[in-house]
Amino acid sequence: MKKTMLLLFVLVATLSASAQYYPDGRPIPPRHRYGNNRGYHRGSSFDQFSDTYFGFRLGMAVATVHSDAANLDGSDSRTGLDVGVVAGKRITNAAPLFFESGLSYTEKGGKGRYEGDKFTYRLQYLELPLLIKYKYPVARDITIEPYAGGYLALGVGGKVKDYGKREAYSSFSNEKGSFRRFDGGLRIGCGASFDRLYVGMSYDVGLANVGHYDFEDTRTGSFNLHIGVTF
């Protein structure tokens, strides 16, 4: 994980160093690098480098739960829904660097076996991302957008299913076989915008111990794919 974060930092630094400049040394804003079209094609009403943007994202999360406690270790992945809205604000005029946040509904969890019996976890969260994004223009209307940051999450629903005991109960309760509601972690990813269309992928690493066992760590993780539109 540390190597991945370092590679992303080097990538962003390299892209920043390759920025174009006016003869007097001032950086050329990305919106001006393609002449009078300001970075978007003739007839388009959307500017990739406006100071603010809003968007809708729809995708899937391939999630796991890794735990030192055998009855919580859902290290086999399960797939869930990931849908939400985002908003971004440019934070400097020296580079196309943005702060992005929003709100999403995400389904995480996992599946595995305990004492020979199958179990599954479905963990439903509301998530608040806190990200720094760099928009690098590669052609008119096309940007590559690496980002990194973190997220905060609140568990709002879900089920634990124990197929051996033929039982199902709430994912978030005070029971030893369930989970704490609050989660949070790191997020790293990269997207691409084609005019208003957005596609992207990200990886979440949970940092909070979401299990009720104080001496055995239980953490979530997920790989996410998204499509969406930006305004």
Please provide the spans of the model-predicted regions.
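Hydrophobic h-region of N-terminal signal peptides that target proteins for export
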Residues: V10-S18
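Short glycine/proline- and aromatic-enriched beta-strand/turn motifs that initiate or cap beta-hairpins
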Residues: Q20-D82
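Outer-membrane beta-barrel "beta-signal"
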Residues: R196, R219-F231
